Regions:
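Bacterial N-terminal signal peptides that target proteins for export
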Residues: 2-14
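Intrinsic low-complexity/disordered segments
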Residues: 5-6, 18, 30, 41
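Histidine (H) residue identity feature
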Residues: 8-9, 138-143, 228-230, 270, ...
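Low-complexity, intrinsically disordered or signal/transmembrane-proximal segments
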Residues: 8-9, 21, 33, 44
């Protein structure tokens, strides 16, 4: 009898413990949900884990418009190089002006970063299907790899097809992309999927030469030749708006033309090679980079001549040297403001 009574009471005790534990878990879950609801609106970066986007949105086709009263801004979508990097997408900069986004180069990872920047800075124009235009400095893969993602991500929701500007060869590249993506277009338009704009996949490619290549509502974009070794043509861009002058180098060795275009610029975005890192490479790679890219000392001399208000280093090759070393190398010669860009920086 005593054994039965003991077993009965022990069973009741275990059940009670389970009920208490379940209640505690439910309360904890509710508190966590309430906490997350308060801290992270849809699409915002999760505060506890900045790499997690808590609510990717399917933007409406005619969604919110970027505030046209904002001053001219540049968002760094890619500060990296051809070398895969978990922290840096390949080269890409986004100009935000009068409610539109204009991309300059579109290396691998740039479009995912554009989506992050759209929500981080509340810039609807950076949602991929809202980006109107892209300007390419040259056709190396680390400057063009995300062109297909830009043109074809949710293409059916574009109001208009993408406008692309760049050097000779761009038209052939966009035709090849259209052929590559033809099965996707056929599958989406051949069934019952709603396609608000069945021609939204079309890319209008303009092969440019030196001079003004785009003007709209006070925005002037000028292309100029740069010296990227045997890659010809290769362009830099000078952007002029009512409130800013911005110069983008693209890939280039020291360029007198670029130095002239950058005189008095508000911001000069320039590629750079760390001399400390380059010294450890083979003579063949040293010869190549000296002929096609700008070393830190040459960039400092260019900045000393042009005197931009702000020099932003992007597309930096460090070759094992600490990243800040290249900043020190520039500052040893030029005493102006120097910033080493990171992905999603905004200026």
């Amino acid at each position: 009898m005593s054994i039965r009574i003991f077993a009965h009471h022990w069973t009741k005790f275990i059940l009670a413990c389970c009920i208490v534990q379940l209640g505690a878990c439910s309360a904890s879950t509710a508190n966590l949900q309430n906490s997350n609801a308060g801290n992270n609106a849809p699409g915002q970066i999760n505060g506890a884990n900045p790499s997690v986007v808590t609510g990717a949105r399917n933007e409406p086709r005619n969604g919110p418009v970027t505030d046209i009263s904002r001053p001219t801004q540049i968002v760094v979508l890619g500060s990296g190089t051809p070398i895969p990097d978990a922290k840096r997408a390949s080269a890409s900069l986004a100009l935000i002006y009068q409610g539109e986004a204009y991309l300059f180069d579109v290396g691998a990872g740039a479009i995912r970063n554009a989506t992050k920047a759209r929500y981080r800075y509340d810039i609807p124009a950076l949602y991929p299907s809202q980006i109107c235009c892209v300007f390419l400095t040259h056709l190396h893969s680390d400057h063009t790899m995300d062109l297909v993602e830009l043109a074809y991500t949710m293409w059916w929701r574009r109001r208009d097809g993408l406008l692309a500007f760049g050097p000779d060869g761009l038209a052939g590249m966009t035709r090849a992309l259209a052929q590559f993506m033809a099965p996707d277009v056929s599958l989406r338009t051949g069934g019952n999927q709603p396609t608000p704009n069945p021609l939204g996949y079309r890319v209008s490619a303009t092969e440019i030469s030196e001079g003004i290549v785009f003007e709209k509502d006070g925005l002037i974009i000028e292309a100029f030749d740069v010296n990227h070794g045997h890659v010809k043509p290769a362009y830099g861009y000078k952007i002029t708006t009512p409130d800013k002058v911005i110069v983008i180098s693209g890939d280039t060795a020291y360029s007198e033309i670029l130095a002239q275009k950058a005189v008095g610029a508000d911001i000069l975005f320039h590629e750079v090679v760390s001399e400390a890192g380059l010294g450890g490479r083979s003579i063949f790679w040293q010869n190549y980079h000296n002929s096609a890219h700008t070393t830190s000392s040459n960039l400092a001399k260019l900045a000393r001549s042009a005197k931009p208000a702000k020099l932003v280093l992007y597309h930096g090759l460090h070759f094992g040297a600490p990243e800040q070393k290249v900043v020190e190398e520039v500052r040893a010669i030029w005493d102006g403001e120097v910033i080493l860009a990171n992905d999603l920086d905004i200026f």
